[in-house]
Amino acid sequence: MTKSTVDEIRERFDADVERFSNLETGQSATMDSALALDLVARTAAAVTPHAKDLLDIGCGAGNFSLKLLSYLPGLSITLNDLSQPMLVRAGERIATQTCGSLARVQADIREWEPGLEKFDVIVAAAVLHHLRTPAEWEATFTKLFNALRPGGGFWIFDLVKHEIPTVQETQWSRYSDYLVDFQGNGYRDKVFAYIEKEDTPAPLTYQLELLRRV
């Protein structure tokens, strides 16, 4: 199957802002979204308690930045997303919650250069599964590692694929059950259809090995 283009992905997210705007539930099509929000924010704050600058890749409507602000008040935040409506909503929600600076960058992370040693914390939540090739994974991880200050942290929450088929089938079955319980068979089919069309998740072990290499 031919995967979605960048423009097609942007258009879908432009029309789906509300689903990404609830801090209590997180992104509802994702299992354990609210738990992940808190775990990432709480752990990032513990690891880098004196963090000043946050980069939120694929920020959506800003949930991860907002949750991090609850643990690290006053952060200066750079928001990055393909979708301008998402960036607008994220900026509106965050601007009143921090005394730090706020920047918004509408760009594909594959094409944007965030700079060298500019951030203490980088978060990439449900975005890296849009990377298509090993070269894109390596280039993106390299630029994000280079954008971290010494002692900084890079935090990922994402859809992953498992190398062992039976494990993949088991986790996919559990995800199916979650979606059906949440909104029924039709919703499950809709989510699975756009994952098939749009996403190219990589195994966790692959990502860890690549992070060590870069």
Where are these regions (language model features)?
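Conserved class I S-adenosyl-L-methionine
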Residues: 1-48, 67
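Class I SAM-dependent methyltransferase SAM/SAH-binding core
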Residues: 53-57, 61-112
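A conserved beta-strand element that flanks and buttresses the S-adenosyl-L-methionine
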Residues: 123
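Short catalytic micro-motifs in class I SAM-dependent methyltransferases
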Residues: 126-130
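A short glycine-rich, Lys/Arg-flanked "PGG" loop and its adjoining helix->strand segment in the class I
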Residues: 138-150
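Short glycine-centered segments of the SAM/dcSAM-binding site in methyltransferase folds
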Residues: 152-154
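C-terminal alpha-helical "lid/dimerization" subdomain adjacent to the S-adenosyl-L-methionine
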Residues: 157-212
